[in-house]
Amino acid sequence: MENELLNHPHNNNMVNGHQDAPYDALSMKNDAEMLEQIKQLLMENNNLKETMKQMNQEMKERLEELLKRHNQHLLDLNSANEVLRKELQSLKEKIATSNQGSAVCSTSEEASENKQLKNQLTRLQAEKADLLGLISELQLKLGSFSEDSFVEIGFSERESGEIVNEEKANKILSDHNISYRTNSIKEEGGGTEPEEVAISRLLRSLREETQKVERLEKELFSANKRLAELEKQTSEFCDKGVQTEQESEQSQSEVIISSEVDILKEKVKSLNKELQETNDKLNEAKQFKNSLQEKCILLDKRLQENQVDLEEKQSLRYSIKKLELQVESQESEIKLEQNKTEAEKNQLGILQVSYDKLNSEYQELRIREIEKVSKVEFNELLEKLDVCEKALAKKQFEIDEMREMDTKHEEDKETIELLRAQVDVYCADFHAERSARENIHQEKEQLATRLAYMIQEYEKLKEEMMGKQSIEQLQRRHGATSLLDASEGPYLVARGAANMEQPSITVYTCPKCNLTVPDMDTLQIHVMDCIT
């Protein structure tokens, strides 16, 4: 349809005798440029969609890695807590054996200390249960992500009994079933909203993880305090046991307890190091989050630009449809006019046949009258006949001219309507291009002003740096000479007064403090220092 629009006016103009080839060439160029721009916009949209898909996949992979690391860290903490609990139980058993050896002297004190140790053990076990509960809450909150967050964590806990034992902890750890599930990317039109929701949920999960890490640090600090208290109590208990008869056995138990306490301290230090590593990983996740936010901002800008381009495309499609409808209407009008011309041709054929009949009859009548009338009348009739033929020829010529003018007018009407439609399209394109060029020109002017301002500032800074460097070089070069001249100033002035007859010697003096200087460079440096 577009090729018909572009070629049809050209043919009509050639029929009418007018040559509008440059105008048609410009229209062809503009249409080709518009088609190229539309293709470029479609390619850019496809590229943006591919980049969005790649970004989504990268985010999914990074989230899966972070969740795996977090779960591994939780499992390590649980195992460390179990080891600590076992060591505390072994310490308790050793203390109980040592208490049985010294039960003869201090049964009441040992019973009270045993009760305290039992209470502390129950507290530690309760704290361990709280830690396991926190871990389960963490995994529940991580599992509460929807399909848009690309990760789903499900787990089932088996807990029974009042105090958490090793077997129950192992069951809980074995029953944590982590399943990762990636979400399918939505269609091209509506891919921005789930990504924003996923990013916001990721930010929330990162905040919750940082808060939980802080809680774990506090709990580790409290556990360290309790371990210190246990160490103090064991040391006190050892001091009391020294007074008993079994000094050798108690000394051995003290050595064992101190070694075990050192081992516990080392394990606590390792746990602190692991916490620091988790904090570093969280910082890396925050940096990755910031980079993702920047990328999302860039993608939003690109989407806005694509929306503007899509609106322009829709307007172009609307104009193309409008032109197609106009072409169809003009084709229907052309068909009607062709039918009219065929009917007129049929009428002309009928008139021509009748004219031929009349002419033949006229010739026969003329021959008969010639035979009848005289020569004078014959001549008069011939003259009249010539006049009538001339009049008929004139009328026929005028009729032909009127027909040609009518056909030309009809063709001119068609060309005028097509040209008007093209002029409307070209005007719309011209206004759009002019507005775009004005915007580009304004942006160029703003960038040029900024560039000139930055160049001026750069030149100023460069001049200042060059001046400072030259002054520093001069100061380094003539620093020693200025000090010597300051000490020998009066002597040089007196000598200059004595030798006024020597015109070749030039004396450089400061106008403020009357200090004589051997060089102009040192004088400039001294004047700058003296004025400041």
UniProtKB/Swiss-Prot annotation:
MF terms (GO), sorted A to Z: K63-linked polyubiquitin modification-dependent protein binding; zinc ion binding
Biological role: Probably part of the TNF-alpha signaling pathway that can shift the equilibrium toward induction of cell death. May act by regulating membrane trafficking and cellular morphogenesis.
Positions with a binding annotation for Zn(2+): C510, C513, H526, C530
GO cellular component: autophagosome; cytoplasm; Golgi apparatus; nucleus; perinuclear region of cytoplasm; recycling endosome
Intracellular or extracellular location(s): Cytoplasm; Cytoplasm, Perinuclear region; Golgi apparatus; Golgi apparatus, trans-Golgi network
Source organism, top-level taxon: Eukaryota
Zinc finger (CCHC NOA-type): 502-532
Pfam families from the UniProt entry: CC2-LZ, NEMO, zf_C2H2_10
Gene Ontology biological process terms, A to Z: Golgi ribbon formation; protein localization to Golgi apparatus; regulation of canonical NF-kappaB signal transduction
Keyword Cytoplasm: yes
Organism: Xenopus laevis
Protein name, entry field: Optineurin
